[in-house]
Amino acid sequence: MERELVIVVDFGGQYNQLIARRVRENNVYCEIVPYTYSVDKIKEKNPRGIIFTGGPNSVYDDNAPKISEDIFEIGVPVLGICYGHQLICTTLGGKVESAQVREYGKTDVVLNNSSGLFSGIDKNESCWMSHTDFVSYPPEGFKIIGKSGESPVAAVENIDKKIYGVQFHPEVEHTPFGKKMLSNFLFDICNLKGDWSMSSFVDEKIKSIKEEVGDKKVICAMSGGVDSSVAAMIVHKAVGKQLTCIFVDHGLLRKDEGDQVEDIFKKQFNMNFIRVNAEKRFLQKLKDISDPEKKRKIIGEEFIRVFEEEAKKLGEIAFLVQGTIYPDVVESGLGTSATIKSHHNVGGLPEDMDFKLIEPLRELFKDEVRAVGEELGIPHKLVWRQPFPGPGLAIRVLGNITEEKLQITRDADAIFREEIAKANLDETIWQYFACLPNIRSVGVMGDERTYCYTIALRAVISTDAMTSDWARIPYEVLDKVSRRIVNEVKGVNRIVYDITSKPPATIEWE
Protein backbone atom coordinates (compact mmCIF):
# COMPACT_ATOMS: atom_id res chain seq x y z
CA MET A 1 0.00 0.00 0.00
CA GLU A 2 1.33 3.42 -0.96
CA ARG A 3 1.93 5.54 2.12
CA GLU A 4 0.77 9.12 2.51
CA LEU A 5 3.41 11.69 1.61
CA VAL A 6 3.91 15.41 2.21
CA ILE A 7 6.64 17.20 0.25
CA VAL A 8 8.61 19.98 1.98
CA VAL A 9 10.17 22.28 -0.64
CA ASP A 10 13.43 23.70 0.73
CA PHE A 11 14.21 27.37 0.09
CA GLY A 12 17.25 27.47 2.39
CA GLY A 13 15.72 28.40 5.75
CA GLN A 14 17.33 27.43 9.05
CA TYR A 15 14.25 25.55 10.32
CA ASN A 16 13.59 23.37 7.28
CA GLN A 17 14.44 20.03 8.87
CA LEU A 18 12.39 21.04 11.89
CA ILE A 19 9.33 21.48 9.64
CA ALA A 20 9.77 17.92 8.38
CA ARG A 21 10.17 16.60 11.92
CA ARG A 22 6.98 18.37 13.01
CA VAL A 23 5.10 16.72 10.14
CA ARG A 24 6.43 13.30 11.09
CA GLU A 25 5.48 13.85 14.73
CA ASN A 26 1.92 13.65 13.39
CA ASN A 27 2.66 10.17 11.95
CA VAL A 28 2.75 11.59 8.44
CA TYR A 29 5.74 10.72 6.25
CA CYS A 30 7.39 13.62 4.48
CA GLU A 31 10.45 14.29 2.34
CA ILE A 32 12.49 17.44 1.81
CA VAL A 33 13.32 18.38 -1.79
CA PRO A 34 15.27 21.42 -3.06
CA TYR A 35 13.35 24.25 -4.73
CA THR A 36 15.11 23.30 -7.99
CA TYR A 37 13.21 19.98 -7.98
CA SER A 38 10.92 19.95 -11.02
CA VAL A 39 7.15 20.02 -10.73
CA ASP A 40 7.00 16.82 -12.81
CA LYS A 41 9.22 15.01 -10.28
CA ILE A 42 7.05 16.25 -7.43
CA LYS A 43 3.96 14.98 -9.29
CA GLU A 44 5.59 11.55 -9.72
CA LYS A 45 5.91 11.26 -5.94
CA ASN A 46 2.13 11.70 -5.66
CA PRO A 47 2.15 13.93 -2.56
CA ARG A 48 -0.99 14.63 -0.56
CA GLY A 49 0.25 18.06 0.49
CA ILE A 50 3.14 20.49 -0.14
CA ILE A 51 4.88 22.88 2.27
CA PHE A 52 7.15 25.75 1.17
CA THR A 53 9.80 26.58 3.78
CA GLY A 54 11.36 29.85 4.83
CA GLY A 55 14.59 31.14 3.33
CA PRO A 56 17.18 33.93 3.66
CA ASN A 57 16.40 35.70 0.36
CA SER A 58 14.08 38.52 -0.65
CA VAL A 59 11.51 37.39 -3.21
CA TYR A 60 12.01 40.53 -5.31
CA ASP A 61 15.75 39.90 -5.83
CA ASP A 62 16.63 38.81 -9.38
CA ASN A 63 18.49 35.71 -8.15
CA ALA A 64 15.97 34.77 -5.45
CA PRO A 65 14.70 31.16 -5.50
CA LYS A 66 11.50 30.80 -7.49
CA ILE A 67 9.14 27.98 -8.31
CA SER A 68 6.91 27.26 -11.28
CA GLU A 69 3.28 28.35 -11.00
CA ASP A 70 2.45 24.84 -12.27
CA ILE A 71 2.97 23.50 -8.75
CA PHE A 72 -0.35 25.04 -7.76
CA GLU A 73 -2.05 23.02 -10.51
CA ILE A 74 -1.07 19.65 -9.02
CA GLY A 75 -4.31 19.89 -7.09
CA VAL A 76 -3.08 19.24 -3.55
CA PRO A 77 -3.06 21.69 -0.61
CA VAL A 78 -0.06 24.02 -0.34
CA LEU A 79 1.19 25.81 2.78
CA GLY A 80 3.85 28.53 2.58
CA ILE A 81 5.89 29.51 5.64
CA CYS A 82 7.71 32.90 5.87
CA TYR A 83 9.59 33.13 2.54
CA GLY A 84 7.23 30.45 1.23
CA HIS A 85 4.27 32.66 2.16
CA GLN A 86 5.80 35.63 0.34
CA LEU A 87 6.65 33.46 -2.67
CA ILE A 88 3.07 32.23 -2.99
CA CYS A 89 1.77 35.79 -2.87
CA THR A 90 4.21 37.25 -5.42
CA THR A 91 3.93 34.27 -7.79
CA LEU A 92 0.13 34.53 -7.86
CA GLY A 93 -0.09 38.31 -8.21
CA GLY A 94 0.22 39.76 -4.71
CA LYS A 95 2.84 42.26 -3.57
CA VAL A 96 5.81 42.00 -1.19
CA GLU A 97 7.67 45.04 0.14
CA SER A 98 10.68 45.74 2.33
CA ALA A 99 9.58 46.50 5.89
CA GLN A 100 10.40 49.77 7.63
CA VAL A 101 10.49 47.88 10.94
CA ARG A 102 11.80 44.33 11.01
CA GLU A 103 9.77 41.72 12.91
CA TYR A 104 12.04 39.32 14.73
CA GLY A 105 11.24 37.18 17.75
CA LYS A 106 8.05 36.91 19.77
CA THR A 107 5.22 38.79 18.03
CA ASP A 108 1.52 39.20 18.78
CA VAL A 109 -0.76 38.11 15.95
CA VAL A 110 -4.52 38.31 15.39
CA LEU A 111 -5.96 35.23 13.65
CA ASN A 112 -9.26 34.48 11.96
CA ASN A 113 -10.09 31.23 13.70
CA SER A 114 -13.06 30.57 11.45
CA SER A 115 -10.42 29.47 8.92
CA GLY A 116 -9.78 25.74 8.87
CA LEU A 117 -6.07 26.45 9.28
CA PHE A 118 -6.65 28.11 12.67
CA SER A 119 -9.56 25.97 13.89
CA GLY A 120 -9.36 25.41 17.65
CA ILE A 121 -6.80 28.22 18.07
CA ASP A 122 -7.41 31.47 19.96
CA LYS A 123 -7.97 34.67 18.02
CA ASN A 124 -5.15 36.50 19.82
CA GLU A 125 -1.90 34.54 19.94
CA SER A 126 1.85 35.05 20.07
CA CYS A 127 4.18 33.60 17.43
CA TRP A 128 7.78 33.65 16.21
CA MET A 129 8.56 36.03 13.36
CA SER A 130 11.85 36.38 11.49
CA HIS A 131 11.55 38.61 8.41
CA THR A 132 12.51 41.94 6.87
CA ASP A 133 9.99 41.84 4.00
CA PHE A 134 6.20 41.62 4.27
CA VAL A 135 3.20 40.93 2.06
CA SER A 136 1.48 44.30 1.53
CA TYR A 137 -1.54 42.85 -0.29
CA PRO A 138 -2.54 39.32 -1.21
CA PRO A 139 -3.25 37.83 -4.66
CA GLU A 140 -6.73 37.94 -6.12
CA GLY A 141 -8.95 35.23 -4.66
CA PHE A 142 -7.04 35.16 -1.35
CA LYS A 143 -8.49 36.13 2.01
CA ILE A 144 -6.42 37.67 4.83
CA ILE A 145 -6.74 35.41 7.89
CA GLY A 146 -3.99 36.82 10.10
CA LYS A 147 -2.24 40.11 10.84
CA SER A 148 0.36 41.55 13.21
CA GLY A 149 1.57 45.05 14.04
CA GLU A 150 4.01 45.18 11.10
CA SER A 151 2.46 42.52 8.85
CA PRO A 152 -1.00 43.45 7.55
CA VAL A 153 -1.04 40.15 5.64
CA ALA A 154 0.46 37.72 8.17
CA ALA A 155 -1.66 34.81 6.93
CA VAL A 156 -3.75 34.12 3.81
CA GLU A 157 -5.97 31.43 2.38
CA ASN A 158 -7.59 30.48 -0.91
CA ILE A 159 -10.16 27.91 0.13
CA ASP A 160 -11.09 26.88 -3.41
CA LYS A 161 -7.48 26.07 -4.37
CA LYS A 162 -6.48 25.02 -0.82
CA ILE A 163 -3.48 27.36 -0.80
CA TYR A 164 -2.36 28.86 2.52
CA GLY A 165 0.47 31.11 3.66
CA VAL A 166 1.75 32.29 7.06
CA GLN A 167 4.46 34.86 7.73
CA PHE A 168 5.39 33.35 11.10
CA HIS A 169 7.15 30.05 11.90
CA PRO A 170 4.65 27.44 13.19
CA GLU A 171 7.39 24.79 13.44
CA VAL A 172 9.32 26.40 16.34
CA GLU A 173 8.52 26.05 20.04
CA HIS A 174 8.15 29.85 20.32
CA THR A 175 4.89 29.61 18.34
CA PRO A 176 2.72 27.83 20.95
CA PHE A 177 -0.17 27.12 18.56
CA GLY A 178 2.13 26.00 15.72
CA LYS A 179 1.74 22.25 16.24
CA LYS A 180 -2.04 22.58 16.28
CA MET A 181 -1.95 24.67 13.09
CA LEU A 182 0.21 22.10 11.29
CA SER A 183 -2.09 19.34 12.51
CA ASN A 184 -5.07 21.25 11.06
CA PHE A 185 -3.27 21.52 7.73
CA LEU A 186 -2.37 17.84 7.61
CA PHE A 187 -5.60 16.26 8.82
CA ASP A 188 -8.38 18.75 8.08
CA ILE A 189 -7.08 20.36 4.88
CA CYS A 190 -4.97 17.55 3.33
CA ASN A 191 -7.34 14.89 4.78
CA LEU A 192 -4.49 12.63 5.84
CA LYS A 193 -4.91 9.69 8.20
CA GLY A 194 -1.37 9.50 9.63
CA ASP A 195 -0.09 6.06 8.60
CA TRP A 196 3.63 6.57 9.33
CA SER A 197 4.90 4.59 12.33
CA MET A 198 8.19 3.05 13.34
CA SER A 199 6.71 -0.44 13.54
CA SER A 200 5.43 -0.25 9.95
CA PHE A 201 8.77 1.25 8.87
CA VAL A 202 10.70 -1.65 10.43
CA ASP A 203 8.46 -4.28 8.81
CA GLU A 204 8.77 -2.65 5.36
CA LYS A 205 12.53 -2.21 5.67
CA ILE A 206 13.21 -5.79 6.77
CA LYS A 207 11.15 -7.10 3.86
CA SER A 208 12.93 -4.91 1.27
CA ILE A 209 16.42 -5.78 2.60
CA LYS A 210 15.62 -9.52 2.44
CA GLU A 211 14.56 -9.16 -1.18
CA GLU A 212 17.60 -7.07 -2.13
CA VAL A 213 20.28 -9.13 -0.40
CA GLY A 214 19.04 -12.62 -1.26
CA ASP A 215 21.73 -15.10 -0.22
CA LYS A 216 24.71 -12.71 -0.48
CA LYS A 217 27.05 -11.57 2.31
CA VAL A 218 26.85 -8.21 4.08
CA ILE A 219 29.31 -6.34 6.30
CA CYS A 220 28.87 -3.40 8.64
CA ALA A 221 31.55 -1.14 10.08
CA MET A 222 30.13 -0.77 13.56
CA SER A 223 31.20 2.13 15.76
CA GLY A 224 28.97 1.35 18.74
CA GLY A 225 27.06 4.58 18.16
CA VAL A 226 23.29 4.73 17.83
CA ASP A 227 23.11 4.99 14.02
CA SER A 228 25.42 2.11 13.11
CA SER A 229 23.96 -0.08 15.88
CA VAL A 230 20.35 0.41 14.77
CA ALA A 231 21.29 0.01 11.09
CA ALA A 232 23.10 -3.25 11.86
CA MET A 233 20.18 -4.54 13.91
CA ILE A 234 17.65 -3.97 11.11
CA VAL A 235 19.87 -5.80 8.62
CA HIS A 236 20.48 -8.61 11.12
CA LYS A 237 16.72 -9.05 11.52
CA ALA A 238 16.47 -9.32 7.73
CA VAL A 239 19.40 -11.59 6.83
CA GLY A 240 20.69 -13.06 10.10
CA LYS A 241 24.13 -14.67 9.89
CA GLN A 242 24.74 -13.32 6.38
CA LEU A 243 25.71 -10.08 8.18
CA THR A 244 29.11 -9.66 9.81
CA CYS A 245 29.79 -6.60 11.96
CA ILE A 246 33.38 -5.39 12.21
CA PHE A 247 34.02 -3.34 15.34
CA VAL A 248 37.40 -1.60 15.21
CA ASP A 249 38.44 -0.84 18.79
CA HIS A 250 41.01 1.91 18.34
CA GLY A 251 41.59 2.37 22.07
CA LEU A 252 39.96 5.79 22.00
CA LEU A 253 36.54 4.76 23.31
CA ARG A 254 34.81 5.75 26.53
CA LYS A 255 35.15 3.64 29.66
CA ASP A 256 33.98 0.03 29.13
CA GLU A 257 32.32 1.02 25.84
CA GLY A 258 33.91 -1.69 23.71
CA ASP A 259 32.92 -4.42 26.16
CA GLN A 260 29.33 -3.13 26.31
CA VAL A 261 28.96 -3.13 22.53
CA GLU A 262 30.40 -6.64 22.26
CA ASP A 263 28.16 -7.96 25.04
CA ILE A 264 25.02 -6.59 23.38
CA PHE A 265 25.60 -7.57 19.78
CA LYS A 266 27.72 -10.71 20.05
CA LYS A 267 26.32 -12.30 23.18
CA GLN A 268 22.80 -10.90 23.55
CA PHE A 269 21.81 -10.76 19.86
CA ASN A 270 24.12 -13.55 18.64
CA MET A 271 25.47 -11.59 15.67
CA ASN A 272 28.56 -12.43 13.66
CA PHE A 273 30.68 -9.86 15.46
CA ILE A 274 34.40 -9.28 14.98
CA ARG A 275 36.13 -7.03 17.50
CA VAL A 276 39.55 -5.90 16.38
CA ASN A 277 41.82 -4.74 19.21
CA ALA A 278 43.93 -2.13 17.45
CA GLU A 279 44.77 0.20 20.34
CA LYS A 280 48.57 -0.12 20.11
CA ARG A 281 48.46 0.34 16.36
CA PHE A 282 46.45 3.57 16.56
CA LEU A 283 48.40 5.06 19.48
CA GLN A 284 51.68 4.41 17.69
CA LYS A 285 50.41 6.30 14.63
CA LEU A 286 49.19 9.17 16.86
CA LYS A 287 52.40 9.51 18.83
CA ASP A 288 53.48 13.18 19.17
CA ILE A 289 50.58 14.39 16.96
CA SER A 290 48.79 17.41 18.45
CA ASP A 291 46.96 18.97 15.48
CA PRO A 292 43.29 17.85 15.58
CA GLU A 293 42.91 17.62 11.80
CA LYS A 294 46.01 15.43 11.56
CA LYS A 295 44.59 13.23 14.31
CA ARG A 296 41.34 12.84 12.38
CA LYS A 297 43.15 12.00 9.16
CA ILE A 298 45.44 9.44 10.79
CA ILE A 299 42.54 7.74 12.58
CA GLY A 300 40.42 7.68 9.40
CA GLU A 301 43.21 6.21 7.29
CA GLU A 302 44.17 3.60 9.88
CA PHE A 303 40.52 2.64 10.34
CA ILE A 304 40.31 1.93 6.61
CA ARG A 305 43.42 -0.26 6.70
CA VAL A 306 42.14 -2.30 9.65
CA PHE A 307 38.66 -2.61 8.12
CA GLU A 308 40.13 -3.68 4.78
CA GLU A 309 42.27 -6.39 6.39
CA GLU A 310 39.31 -7.86 8.25
CA ALA A 311 36.88 -7.60 5.32
CA LYS A 312 39.25 -9.48 3.00
CA LYS A 313 39.32 -12.39 5.44
CA LEU A 314 35.57 -12.85 4.91
CA GLY A 315 35.74 -13.59 1.20
CA GLU A 316 33.35 -12.11 -1.34
CA ILE A 317 31.11 -9.41 0.13
CA ALA A 318 28.27 -7.85 -1.87
CA PHE A 319 26.82 -5.24 0.50
CA LEU A 320 28.01 -2.65 3.01
CA VAL A 321 25.70 -1.32 5.74
CA GLN A 322 26.02 2.39 6.46
CA GLY A 323 24.25 4.34 9.22
CA THR A 324 23.37 7.35 7.06
CA ILE A 325 20.37 9.24 8.48
CA TYR A 326 18.04 11.74 6.82
CA PRO A 327 19.86 14.95 7.86
CA ASP A 328 23.00 13.54 6.17
CA VAL A 329 21.00 13.04 2.97
CA VAL A 330 19.45 16.52 3.06
CA GLU A 331 22.66 18.36 3.94
CA SER A 332 24.80 16.58 1.35
CA GLY A 333 22.18 16.61 -1.42
CA LEU A 334 22.60 12.87 -1.95
CA GLY A 335 20.51 11.18 -4.60
CA THR A 336 19.50 7.56 -4.91
CA SER A 337 21.86 4.99 -3.44
CA ALA A 338 24.29 3.42 -5.86
CA THR A 339 27.32 1.15 -5.82
CA ILE A 340 30.08 3.10 -4.11
CA LYS A 341 33.80 2.94 -3.52
CA SER A 342 33.81 5.24 -0.53
CA HIS A 343 32.17 5.45 2.84
CA HIS A 344 31.92 8.98 4.14
CA ASN A 345 31.58 7.89 7.77
CA VAL A 346 35.03 6.28 7.78
CA GLY A 347 36.87 8.53 5.37
CA GLY A 348 36.69 6.48 2.17
CA LEU A 349 37.20 2.78 1.56
CA PRO A 350 39.95 1.43 -0.71
CA GLU A 351 39.22 1.59 -4.43
CA ASP A 352 39.31 -2.15 -4.94
CA MET A 353 36.47 -2.74 -2.48
CA ASP A 354 33.19 -2.43 -4.38
CA PHE A 355 30.02 -2.74 -2.35
CA LYS A 356 26.38 -2.07 -2.97
CA LEU A 357 25.23 0.21 -0.20
CA ILE A 358 22.46 -0.59 2.28
CA GLU A 359 21.31 2.50 4.18
CA PRO A 360 18.29 1.39 6.20
CA LEU A 361 18.03 4.66 8.14
CA ARG A 362 18.42 7.19 5.33
CA GLU A 363 14.75 8.23 5.66
CA LEU A 364 14.88 8.85 9.41
CA PHE A 365 15.69 11.71 11.76
CA LYS A 366 17.70 11.00 14.92
CA ASP A 367 14.67 10.79 17.19
CA GLU A 368 13.10 8.29 14.78
CA VAL A 369 16.32 6.22 14.73
CA ARG A 370 16.10 5.96 18.52
CA ALA A 371 12.42 4.95 18.26
CA VAL A 372 13.36 2.20 15.78
CA GLY A 373 16.11 1.04 18.14
CA GLU A 374 13.56 0.68 20.94
CA GLU A 375 11.19 -1.11 18.53
CA LEU A 376 13.95 -3.61 17.70
CA GLY A 377 14.66 -4.34 21.37
CA ILE A 378 18.09 -2.70 21.56
CA PRO A 379 18.78 -1.82 25.22
CA HIS A 380 17.55 1.64 26.22
CA LYS A 381 21.01 2.60 27.44
CA LEU A 382 22.53 2.02 23.98
CA VAL A 383 19.66 3.64 22.09
CA TRP A 384 20.13 6.81 24.15
CA ARG A 385 23.92 6.69 24.03
CA GLN A 386 25.54 10.12 23.87
CA PRO A 387 26.76 11.38 20.48
CA PHE A 388 30.44 10.48 20.21
CA PRO A 389 32.88 11.64 17.53
CA GLY A 390 34.46 9.08 15.21
CA PRO A 391 38.01 9.94 16.37
CA GLY A 392 36.81 9.33 19.93
CA LEU A 393 38.85 10.59 22.86
CA ALA A 394 41.64 11.61 20.47
CA ILE A 395 39.86 14.96 20.03
CA ARG A 396 38.85 15.21 23.69
CA VAL A 397 42.48 15.01 24.73
CA LEU A 398 43.85 18.29 23.42
CA GLY A 399 47.44 18.23 22.24
CA ASN A 400 49.48 15.06 21.96
CA ILE A 401 47.95 11.78 23.12
CA THR A 402 49.36 9.47 25.78
CA GLU A 403 47.88 6.46 27.54
CA GLU A 404 47.94 8.43 30.81
CA LYS A 405 45.93 11.33 29.33
CA LEU A 406 43.43 8.94 27.76
CA GLN A 407 42.89 7.15 31.07
CA ILE A 408 42.43 10.43 32.96
CA THR A 409 39.88 11.64 30.42
CA ARG A 410 38.10 8.27 30.32
CA ASP A 411 37.77 8.09 34.12
CA ALA A 412 36.67 11.72 34.50
CA ASP A 413 34.11 11.32 31.73
CA ALA A 414 32.70 8.17 33.33
CA ILE A 415 32.16 9.99 36.64
CA PHE A 416 30.48 12.93 34.90
CA ARG A 417 28.15 10.63 32.95
CA GLU A 418 27.36 8.58 36.05
CA GLU A 419 26.35 11.64 38.10
CA ILE A 420 24.30 13.13 35.27
CA ALA A 421 22.38 9.83 35.06
CA LYS A 422 21.88 9.74 38.84
CA ALA A 423 20.38 13.24 38.65
CA ASN A 424 17.98 12.03 35.88
CA LEU A 425 19.41 14.56 33.45
CA ASP A 426 20.84 12.06 30.96
CA GLU A 427 17.93 12.23 28.51
CA THR A 428 17.28 15.97 28.79
CA ILE A 429 20.84 17.12 28.06
CA TRP A 430 21.72 16.66 24.37
CA GLN A 431 25.41 15.95 24.96
CA TYR A 432 27.74 15.99 27.95
CA PHE A 433 31.34 14.90 28.36
CA ALA A 434 34.70 15.58 29.99
CA CYS A 435 37.76 16.65 28.04
CA LEU A 436 41.38 17.31 28.90
CA PRO A 437 42.51 20.75 27.63
CA ASN A 438 46.21 19.95 28.18
CA ILE A 439 46.49 22.57 30.91
CA ARG A 440 48.31 22.01 34.19
CA SER A 441 47.77 24.23 37.19
CA VAL A 442 49.01 24.59 40.75
CA GLY A 443 46.92 23.19 43.58
CA VAL A 444 47.15 22.01 47.18
CA MET A 445 46.24 18.47 48.20
CA GLY A 446 47.07 17.06 51.62
CA ASP A 447 49.10 20.16 52.53
CA GLU A 448 51.33 19.55 49.54
CA ARG A 449 51.72 21.57 46.37
CA THR A 450 50.42 19.83 43.22
CA TYR A 451 50.88 20.59 39.56
CA CYS A 452 48.23 18.54 37.77
CA TYR A 453 45.86 18.49 34.82
CA THR A 454 42.62 20.44 34.50
CA ILE A 455 39.45 18.69 33.35
CA ALA A 456 36.84 20.68 31.41
CA LEU A 457 33.20 19.61 31.58
CA ARG A 458 30.94 20.35 28.61
CA ALA A 459 27.15 19.91 28.52
CA VAL A 460 24.78 21.39 25.95
CA ILE A 461 21.08 21.63 25.16
CA SER A 462 20.17 21.21 21.49
CA THR A 463 17.69 19.58 19.12
CA ASP A 464 19.89 19.07 16.06
CA ALA A 465 23.51 19.97 17.03
CA MET A 466 23.47 22.82 14.50
CA THR A 467 23.10 25.29 17.37
CA SER A 468 23.26 24.67 21.11
CA ASP A 469 23.23 26.37 24.49
CA TRP A 470 25.17 25.36 27.58
CA ALA A 471 23.17 23.26 30.02
CA ARG A 472 22.21 24.81 33.36
CA ILE A 473 23.20 21.81 35.46
CA PRO A 474 22.27 22.27 39.16
CA TYR A 475 25.20 23.48 41.26
CA GLU A 476 24.94 20.53 43.64
CA VAL A 477 25.42 18.10 40.72
CA LEU A 478 28.44 20.02 39.40
CA ASP A 479 29.84 20.17 42.94
CA LYS A 480 29.59 16.39 43.36
CA VAL A 481 31.14 15.75 39.93
CA SER A 482 34.02 18.11 40.71
CA ARG A 483 34.75 16.56 44.12
CA ARG A 484 34.58 13.01 42.78
CA ILE A 485 36.91 13.64 39.84
CA VAL A 486 39.52 15.43 41.94
CA ASN A 487 39.41 12.71 44.61
CA GLU A 488 39.12 9.64 42.37
CA VAL A 489 41.10 10.48 39.23
CA LYS A 490 44.83 10.59 39.79
CA GLY A 491 46.57 13.52 38.11
CA VAL A 492 43.68 16.05 38.25
CA ASN A 493 43.42 19.00 40.64
CA ARG A 494 41.04 21.43 38.91
CA ILE A 495 37.62 21.23 37.21
CA VAL A 496 36.14 23.93 34.94
CA TYR A 497 32.70 24.11 33.29
CA ASP A 498 32.34 25.37 29.71
CA ILE A 499 29.48 27.92 29.49
CA THR A 500 29.82 28.79 25.80
CA SER A 501 26.99 28.36 23.30
CA LYS A 502 27.27 27.25 19.66
CA PRO A 503 27.97 29.54 17.91
CA PRO A 504 30.53 30.95 18.65
CA ALA A 505 32.02 27.71 20.00
CA THR A 506 31.54 24.21 18.61
CA ILE A 507 30.22 21.46 20.88
CA GLU A 508 33.50 19.52 20.79
CA TRP A 509 36.71 21.32 21.75
CA GLU A 510 38.62 19.98 18.74
Curated annotation (Swiss-Prot):
Record pathway: Purine metabolism; GMP biosynthesis; GMP from XMP (L-Gln route): step 1/1
Xref: NCBIfam families: guaA_Cterm, guaA_Nterm, PRK00074.1
UniProt-listed HAMAP family: GMP_synthase
GO molecular function: ATP binding; GMP synthase activity
Species of the source: Clostridium kluyveri (strain ATCC 8527 / DSM 555 / NBRC 12016 / NCIMB 10680 / K1)
Oligomeric form and interacting partners: Homodimer.
Amino-acid positions noted as binding ATP in the UniProt annotation, renumbered to this chain: 223-229
Catalytic residues of the enzyme: 82, 169, 171
Protein name: GMP synthase [glutamine-hydrolyzing]
One Pfam family this sequence matches: tRNA_Me_trans
Domain Glutamine amidotransferase type-1: residue ranges: 5-195
SUPFAM superfamilies recorded: Adenine nucleotide alpha hydrolases-like (SSF52402), Class I glutamine amidotransferase-like (SSF52317)
Keywords associated with the record: ATP-binding, Glutamine amidotransferase, GMP biosynthesis, Ligase, Nucleotide-binding, Purine biosynthesis
InterPro entries given in the database record: Class_I_gatase-like, GATASE, GMP_synth_C, GMP_synth_GATase, GMP_synthase, GMPS_ATP_PPase_dom, Rossmann-like_a/b/a_fold
